[in-house]
UniProtKB/Swiss-Prot annotation:
Cellular location(s): Cell membrane
GO aspect biological process, one term: protein folding
Catalyzed chemical reaction(s): [protein]-peptidylproline (omega=180) = [protein]-peptidylproline (omega=0)
Amino acid composition bias (Basic and acidic residues), ranges on this chain: 259-286, 382-402, 514-531, 773-789, 820-852, 859-868, 887-902, 966-982, 1030-1045
Activity regulation as described: Inhibited by cyclosporin A (CsA).
Record carries keyword Zinc: no
Residues bearing PTM Phosphoserine: 379, 401, 416, 611, 646, 880, 882, 884, 900, 1139, 1148, 1195
Record region (Disordered): 187-625, 651-1453
Name this polypeptide is given: NK-tumor recognition protein
SUPFAM superfamilies reported for this sequence: Cyclophilin-like
Gene3D superfamilies in the cross-refs: Cyclophilin-like
Annotated Gene Ontology cellular component terms: plasma membrane
Amino acid sequence: MGAQDRPQCHFDIEINREPVGRIMFQLFSDICPKTCKNFLCLCSGEKGLGKTTGKKLCYKGSTFHRVVKNFMIQGGDFSEGNGKGGESIYGGYFKDENFILKHDRAFLLSMANRGKHTNGSQFFITTKPAPHLDGVHVVFGLVISGFEVIEQIENLKTDAASRPYADVRVIDCGVLATKLTKDVFEKKRKKPTCSEGSDSSSRSSSSSESSSESEVERETIRRRRHKRRPKVRHAKKRRKEMSSSEEPRRKRTVSPEGYSERSDVNEKRSVDSNTKREKPVVRPEEIPPVPENRFLLRRDMPAITVEPEQNIPDVAPVVSDQKPSVSKSGRKIKGRGTIRYHTPPRSRSHSESKDDDSSETPPHWKEEMQRLRAYRPPSGEKWSKGDKLSDPCSSRWDERSLSQRSRSWSYNGYYSDLSTARHSDGHHKKHRKEKKFKHKKKAKKQKHCRRHRQTKKRRIVMPDLEPSRSPTHRMKSSCVRERRSRASSSSSHHSSKRDWSKSDQDDGSASTHSSRDSYRSKSHSRSDSRGSSRSRAVSKSSSRSLNRSKSRSSSRSGPRRTSISPKKPAQLSENKPVKTEPLRPSVPQNGNVLVQPVAAENIPVIPLSDSPPPSRWKPGQKPWKPSYERIQEMKAKTTHLLPVQSTYSLTNIKATVSSSSYHKREKPSESDGSAYSKYSDRSSGSSGRSGSKSSRSRSSSRSYTRSRSRSLPTSRSLSRSPSSRSHSPNKYSDGSQHSRSSSYTSVSSDDGRRAMFRSNRKKSVTSHKRHRSNSEKTLHSKYVRGREKSSRHRKYSESRSSLDYSSDSDQSHVQVYSAPEKEKQGKVEALNDKQGKGREEGKPKPEWECPRSKKRTPKDHSRDDSVSKGKNCAGSKWDSESNSEQDVTKSRKSDPRRGSEKEEGEASSDSESEVGQSHIKAKPPAKPPTSTFLPGSDGAWKSRRPQSSASESESSCSNLGNIRGEPQKQKHSKDDLKGDHTKRAREKSKAKKDKKHKAPKRKQAFHWQPPLEFGDDEEEEMNGKQVTQDPKEKRHVSEKCEAVKDGIPNVEKTCDEGSSPSKPKKGTLEQDPLAEGGHDPSSCPAPLKVEDNTASSPPSAQHLEEHGPGGGEDVLQTDDNMEICTPDRTSPAKGEVVSPLANHRLDSPEVNIIPEQDECMAHPRAGGEQESSMSESKTLGESGVKQDSSTSVTSPVETSGKKEGAEKSQMNLTDKWKPLQGVGNLSVSTATTSSALDVKALSTVPEVKPQGLRIEIKSKNKVRPGSLFDEVRKTARLNRRPRNQESSSDDQTPSRDGDSQSRSPHRSRSKSETKSRHRTRSVSYSHSRSRSRSSTSSYRSRSYSRSRSRDWYSRGRTRSRSSSYGSFHSHRTSSRSRSRSSSYDLHSRSRSYTYDSYYSRSRSRSRSQRSDSYHRGRSYNRRSRSGRSYGSDSESDRSYSHHRSPSESSRYS
């Protein structure tokens, strides 16, 4: 028939419900009558229902399910819509009519097939000549108009399977009447004759062939329909083969007629090319048998060559389809797969097709697919880079293909952040489902990595995996950081937060991250976080150190800080070892730290792969060193510092001396107060690492400040895990001195201070973490009380410091809990800040606490509904503080995590808002959260609130800091803040487990220095050591309890010892200089605090012991808390509560919460640590980062095993801390522990350096592609950009895991506070709060907070934060903040002197907020760089919002 006689039909196409035009086809009914008739009838729909499919034989409503750019667009599957269905009007398949026409030009209509003689209803329109399809696919028509529609379809984005994301549908189709009449009739006649002859012959001949083949093919099709992928793949091959055969046919035919026809068509095309290119309708009859190999063979590209040979392709494709056909994801395709055409032979011909599995996939897709595949391992490891950590590890990448690359950021997601890290799991699943192939592969890989992390994480995060990871995870999550969506509450929240950070930011996410983050990411702004965080962490560390020192002794801190701070700011700013150098010992160590920061920043990415993931390392494993020369450097420096640490360890007394030298102003205070401050800082650093989150959360105004300073180092540590952690750990672990050095680098001043504090307060640190919890709580209660009193203001500041720690701890905890709810927490914190401010303004503790509880509960609801109950209890506790004591204790049991959360959330938020508000109003609302948190918070509060509040808080912190300070110093040597936190967290976990074996593990506490390093080791060590440490830790806890008990009697002794009760004395002595008129009352409240066990570490132990029978485990845990969490951090009451809850957590999704409750027990320090640890573990799976945190993190992660390991670690930590049981014991223990610690520190120093390094290594080495750390790191990296501080938090998260509590919350906040680290402005604001606390601890917290902030600012945010100062309560804060930021020396001192509570907190907040805004801009840049800017920024905003004020809170919300 003439070209004009040929029938024409049309398709009206719509893309995503929008009509795009009409494609007109001309069918070569003269050449392929049967195929043309099939197509025409399918266009007209006149044939009724198909025999095979039972669907109406009509193209109307069918889709173009396969689009290969520069090749073809395929459609016609009216039954399945995915290339696996469709049938001809003849029933099933019909034979290839002929291959006269060739695929020699574009816009030919050819039949898709699954092999020889498998033509059904599927057709394709070539968009380029496809000679490889000649002899495989039957060309039966061409497009005469609608070319632009075809091109539009061809240019649609498609997935890996070449399936367009858009819905390309034939909304109407039909046959043109004129030709329809003629051609259709002719075709019908011809087709009946030809087609039916063909059909009958097709059916007769093919009856056997086609019948068997058709039936087989039908069955195959049915199978394929069932197994669409396999079928699709096969279908592709067939189609390709069909196309190939059709092309040859068509070419042949087109030669005669085709060319004239083509000229016509070309004319039409030129005319229509602008209009519509109609798909040539492929008649099933005309569709030649497709060489199956070509079309079907994904692996067997030879089929393409078999253009004319249809038989071979038929046979081969089927076989090869089944054998070789592998989906791009590597899945074997069963059946022949969907009908597909081979991609053009050029570059994508059979060979490429083989490679691609479906050559039809455009090269860019292939590349992307390969990239994704290649990335999959990294996706576990490098989530922070491409995706939000929070988003599920696989989810991220997987969703990245699904454009969920920003898996909220979702492996974090981790997550939002919440879902990122933890979403990482949730999203993993979702995304996996979405991207079954990629997701399965990636999800499996990523999820595996992630699960490895999330094994840790999931215990923590599993509940939170709901959101995630993780994500970040996050997040991860786990985003992070960290575990924003983790264990039911803590885990979930932590994981969620992290995931938020990671996913939401971080997911997020979350990282995480959750957190995601965590894990948020806790896991994304890690690199940036590392860079920024590292710089910030260093700055912060220095600031923290300085701040702590300053806080500790405004005067001493100031000058010391001044020298350190300025240097540190510079150093921190530069983030260079050189900066480190300016700080004397600090400098070298700082150099280490800085190097570590750099290493951390750099190392986290590279070294992680160097050796087995740190989590896999044994405690003494060395890959760290090869991985990190900087680790070695840090080791060398740490070794320098180790002696210092040894000195510190050996001499908590020396630490006092060092404190004197380092913080002479605060010497008495320094020993305990400084130790407390340091410890606070450490605790805050540990907790502050956690507090980096915390700090970053700035929710714990002081704690977070301190925590933050430390946390920043931790952040830095996490950022450059070893560095930061080494910073912190080196700060804390490498003998206080190394700590100091590290701290000098990151928290040089902080380090020195902390080192001293640690040396004084290794136990103090341990204590302090506890004590930070306790002290925080004590300070909180003191703070509340003291605040209410005239010394209340000072105490408030001091309490603030403690509270900050507590807040930090709480916040960290909260953050950990809030990992999923990081944002929630940030909001809650922002609300709390508002409420805290309002309450502080209104001074309604209960109210504040209630809102805090409420807010916190919202966060914690996600995190811990049980904790929410606990929170409500905690809120009630807070509200009824007298009842609160027992209630809190009980609540703590039920609400350990909630208490912790509350403490952290409230303390954190309270601290944030309270510090800001304390500083602003110096009201007890922030404190009440802490004190109210304390079981004996009321009793302690009453005692404490007058003087005890500050005094004991500080004393408690100091004592606990001493208790922990020395062990922690030793621990510091080991893991310092990070290690401390991790250890504390672990110790808490272990405290739970090891409360029974407290005493023995003291040496192991030493041993935990390497475990610091054993970020990796920690997990394994945790598992192995946990058992060992558990007894030791329990014994230590018992010892500590005894020490606490003794410390209560021997307040002085315990003071030195680091016991809360003695710490109140010593704290009173030491922290009285810090201006806490409540130190002696602190001593009183210390016992009260013992009542308030949560409030005060020794009191914690006492309290637990008081509640011993009922709280036996609580006592154990509180003991552990006392030991691990003696610092107010845990607020042992909380610890008590934590015990059950911690255990509960351990068991439940609150595994994260368990660590948090363990952390709650050691909450400020260990609790946050643990939570951070959990987060960290989740986020980073950062045992190293969580070495202490690992205990926490690991505990949550490996709820039992890891917790045991964590507790072992913590046992070790506790053991380290434990030596500081009494001042005498502290000295002796310190000496012994120092010696042991020295030995261990020295032996471990390399590891201590590596501890930080290991932390980093844990951060890095430990990072497995799917590990939490990896997620956290990714989150950190991702967060690093978007939320440098958050990133730091995430990065810090591992480090901060050391600061388990703060860090954990900061993990929570590491996603949240990783955001909060970008909330570090928030943290800065919390710093302000910290400063507020430091105001009482006034100088100490606030000043050093200031300084720390300044240093922090100095580093990256010096301006940022400085701007922040100006920006937010820029009024005076601006001046001071700027002063602080501007004159690091001055503002170290200046800030120190400029310690007005409100100022400080304003300043901090200003810094925080401004930093939030500026750093949100700037850090945000970092953080944003991390890619979590939104989450981070949000977190920061939130953080600083709730830090800042209700308005800011609102803003955050």
